[in-house]
Curated annotation (Swiss-Prot):
Residues 10-70 form the HTH tetR-type domain. The keyword Thylakoid does not apply. Residues 33-52 bind DNA. One of its GO terms (cellular component) is cytoplasm. It comes from the Bacteria. The gene is fabR. GO terms for biological process: fatty acid biosynthetic process; negative regulation of fatty acid biosynthetic process. One of its GO terms (molecular function) is DNA-binding transcription factor activity. This is HTH-type transcriptional repressor FabR. Keywords: Cytoplasm, DNA-binding, Fatty acid biosynthesis, Fatty acid metabolism, Lipid biosynthesis, Lipid metabolism, Repressor, Transcription, Transcription regulation. It comes from Klebsiella pneumoniae subsp. pneumoniae (strain ATCC 700721 / MGH 78578). Represses the transcription of fabB, involved in unsaturated fatty acid (UFA) biosynthesis. By controlling UFA production, FabR directly influences the physical properties of the membrane bilayer. It is found in: Cytoplasm. Its main location: cytoplasm.
């Protein structure tokens, strides 16, 4: 990559980081102004268009980055698990770490999931679908259950995790710890339920074939 391309990439990154830093519990992406984001990134507002077509393209890039960050973290969690950690507890603590370290990235995913922009809703749905698919792959590999079962299990788990994540954004450390414990219990219940449901279906099939 040439010097100019490196500089362009650096400025693009500055714009993304500036936009993330301006999000908060009180401030959504829709309320950000191009001028403020450019000023925070240290560039003239007119230079913004060298990097993004418009503010929406910046937002979609942020959605993609948020989803990718979360998926990469969960992959790291699975590597920790491979070294002997508890699957559910390690995954939950990794997820809560992500929210603690990147609250605005998670806020963006939550808000735009049901926001007014169809493009943003589709982008968040795609990120969540990637997340579900990766978890279903992992469950299929670990539990030796058919894809239909692992997909249903992964979808239920991700739904509960995102709901707990929304709560975790607005509570203190002690409440977050309690939330984490409750989430671990709920995920274990789903996991056990999926396992016993699958076994019951297998037993039914073996009775029919006899």
């Amino acid at each position: 990559m040439g010097v100019r391309a490196q500089q362009k990439e650096k400025t693009r990154r500055s714009l993304v980081e500036a936009a993330f830093s301006q999000l908060s519990a009180e401030r959504s992406f829709a309320s950000l102004s191009l001028r403020e984001v450019a000023r925070e990134a240290g560039i003239a507002p007119t230079s913004f268009y060298r990097h993004f077509r418009d503010v929406d393209e910046l937002g979609l890039t942020m959605v993609d980055e948020s989803g990718l960050m979360l998926r990469q973290l969960m992959r790291q969690a699975r590597q920790r698990i491979a070294k002997g950690g508890s699957v559910i507890r390690t995954s939950v603590s990794t997820f809560m770490e992500f929210i603690g370290n990147n609250p605005n990235a998670f806020r963006l995913l939550l808000r735009e999931r049901s926001g007014t922009s169809a493009a943003f809703r589709a982008a968040v749905a795609r990120e969540i679908q990637h997340f579900i698919a990766e978890l279903a792959d992992y469950l299929e590999l670990e539990n030796h259950m058919p894809r239909a079962f692992t997909e249903a299990q992964a979808e239920a788990m991700v739904t509960i995790v995102f709901s707990a994540g929304a709560e975790a954004l607005d509570v203190g450390p002690e409440q977050r710890r309690q939330l984490e414990e409750r989430l671990v219990l709920q995920l274990r219940m789903i996991s056990k339920g999926a396992y016993y449901w699958y076994r019951r279906e297998q037993e039914k099939m073996s009775h029919h074939s006899e």
